[in-house]
């Protein structure tokens, strides 16, 4: 058995409940009150909170969950805390961040989707403004109101104007990346949708230093904020890393640790994770696993050169994850030296499943890279100037035992790791459901902070506090008839008991609803919609009700995520360079006219 998450056994819950009954830092108000919307009593010294958000990490990427990369510091937090095996998030980054920070469904926050994929028909509609709307309060707003200093260092992606930056959403100090990503070594954009890397400190444009590497610098900045703010106050520290989002980049000393690890290819890795998932009880023994997508390349059919290239891409990915963990360790050491570590609650999770997009199959991206100092070659892979990626096959392997990856509401896109540790949380494994909207109310309860006390709190939280589960007062905060639903850009999922319905758009989906029994079939291999039509209709009705309540908009006919990104990117480029493009087009047209006129005159002179 690998260290970290352990297979469940029948006595775990009883032992945890007994231990917690004598060791809780907070004295809860009772089971029934905890299950209702009450908070724990505050302790004499309120705990600090650290939220670590990894970008694009799969369920089994951390060592504690069975991953190949070395993540000893994350694993240490897992060993001393609660590890959630049935946690779901959004399939896209910005909606996850909005829900995580507010406890509110993404459509009610204003961040229903991301700017890169929104269709014109939705732009600016209620819930689709792509920034936190009035009346939506963050956990930073709430904690600052009860005396916390609130700090952030990392990716924001919840608006791109000064008014939409973290300082106007409860944060005292912030270094924030407004885009979906950026280069990890240099102060520059990572895709043509963005003209530059929009970094802001406390709402003002910020230039990165020459020796920048994202994971290191984000931790350095957070340490600086901790050391230069009022140490008499408890702190809320939000660390949303760029790792392991594209471009996948890592210092060579970390990448070198994985030489040869992935040489057997993506089929072998997907099968190995599937076997470990059964050993660890992440899925039942013998549960089926979905085949890799039909357009997946056969590893053995690749040339030796291509196999080496793609194995190296995954080595950099693992190196980037280990580098992030190393700097998390530096941050933890700083808290230990300051004497605050033992009174700090840590929450570690991922915003969605692994990224499948490639950097070698888009003419637009290749053209843009050539003008922005990027390459995708083996030489220097992961280092300055490299635009690293893992592609759809490795992403599907990383998402094992789930199906597909980021963007989709299959399990590979939305089932990710969750760890909560610190005062009031005993070591345990939690197999009951949890959703991204549950995190803010849970953290507020753990520190005894109110959830509905502010005058401008006009949008209610939709998530449920997991406090009763963490304290052993309940096995689950979701009953058999309670629904849990998600929707982003038409990709949708709804859970009820053991069942799940899901719908995914092209290119990997076909926009059809399907029904699965997740207890029997966590790989989503057998559609039950025809054999169990009553359950299907009941859950479709529940999703319709959810959509009406949350203000979900119907997608335009024929919506395709990749096509929409291309259109939106083209629009952005024309907005930035419209007059240059127009002038260039006129010059080309004039040259064509001149050439045609010259040809006409020449032909005329010959015939006269």
Go through each PLM region and give its residues.
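Long, internal low-complexity/basic segments
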Residues: 45-47, 54, 59, 83, ...
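Active-site segment of extracytoplasmic enzymes that catalyze sulfate/phosphate-ester chemistry
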Residues: 58-148, 173, 179, 183-199
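Short, solvent-exposed turn/loop segments enriched in Gly/Ser/Thr/Pro and often Arg
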Residues: 63-69, 83-107, 112-114, 152-164, ...
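C-terminal accessory region downstream of the catalytic core in glycan-modifying enzymes
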Residues: 82, 157, 204-205, 210-215, ...
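Histidine-centered active-site microenvironments of extracellular/periplasmic hydrolases
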Residues: 162-170, 249, 333-421, 567-577
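C-terminal cap/loop subdomain of S1 sulfatases and analogous C-terminal strand-loop tails that border
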Residues: 172-173, 177-183, 383-413, 421-519, ...
